[in-house]
């Protein structure tokens, strides 16, 4: 049985800080190609920003360029422990209608697991 750790792409760990500007957020999401970035403080997850959040913010905010990660992020994102089973990740994604989960290891940000990872490994 595969664990989240087995699927985690350790070198793809998109992250920004609370004060990161919108340009940095967009670059991080684009370069890591997962459609998401964690917002961290002292290696702990404090929020998440998805490409969908960015699109919604474009329609709401008049001065988009002055926004920081803290202004855009969703607080209390869904997370999963690095030692959880991959099937648990799938169930969490299905029940919350999401395609990415932030992964924690001893309450520290460890990376992202994506629905595509589960599909690729035949979990779904």
Which residues fall in each region the model found?
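Glycine-rich acetyl-CoA-binding "A-motif" of GNAT/NAT acetyltransferases
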Residues: 45-48, 109-112
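Phosphate-coordinating loops and pocket residues in cytosolic domains that bind phosphorylated ligands
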Residues: 9, 59-60, 74, 120
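The conserved cystathionine-beta-synthase
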Residues: 15-33, 40, 58, 79-99, ...
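Conserved active-site beta-strand-loop modules that form the wall/rim of enzyme catalytic pockets
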Residues: 34-37, 46-47
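Nucleotide-binding motor/catalytic cores of P-loop/tubulin-like NTPases across gene-expression machines
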Residues: 47, 51-53, 62, 66-69
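Bateman (tandem CBS) regulatory domains
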Residues: 1-13, 66-77
């Amino acid at each position: 049985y595969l664990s989240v750790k087995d699927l985690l792409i350790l070198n793809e760990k998109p992250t920004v800080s609370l004060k990161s500007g919108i340009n940095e957020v967009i670059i991080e999401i684009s370069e890591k190609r997962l459609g998401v970035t964690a917002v961290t403080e002292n290696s702990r997850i404090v929020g998440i920003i998805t490409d969908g959040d960015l699109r919604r913010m474009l329609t709401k905010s008049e001065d988009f360029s002055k926004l920081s990660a803290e202004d855009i992020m969703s607080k209390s994102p869904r997370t999963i422990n690095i030692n959880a089973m991959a099937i648990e990740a799938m169930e969490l994604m299905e029940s919350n209608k999401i395609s990415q989960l932030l992964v924690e290891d001893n309450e520290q940000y460890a990376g992202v697991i994506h629905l595509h990872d589960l599909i690729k490994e035949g979990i779904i």
